[in-house]
Amino acid sequence: MNRLTTDNPQSNFGTMLNMVYGKDGWQYIRHGDDGMLTTDFCLMLCKERGCKVQDDVPTTNEAKDEMLCDCVFEGCPIATIYAALSGFGHVRARLKMYEDAGIAPPGHTLKNGELGSVQL
């Protein structure tokens, strides 16, 4: 069984499985040439959508996170996307810990290398 997590995806499938990742205690999304904080990505979507984003958007990552989380209670679809990205990033981080430790499902051996296909 090939790893599903990688820090350097080489295919569309690999990029999809590793779209959201953690770095320096924050979550990033692979968008453009470099990774972008998921908070900044979602605030960019807010501006493009014409959301009533505060004129002075918070400058700290913590405040941006709180602002996006508060929008969930208003039914904001971008806040829902932010919540999904956050959840996906946490699940990927946990899976990466298992893979880094060499833990695989019973009856399987974990192989390093190109990501294999997965049957769901």
Predicted regions and their residues:
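Extreme N-terminal leader/activation tails
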Residues: 1-82, 102, 109-120
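Long, leucine- and charge-enriched amphipathic alpha-helices
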Residues: 85-109
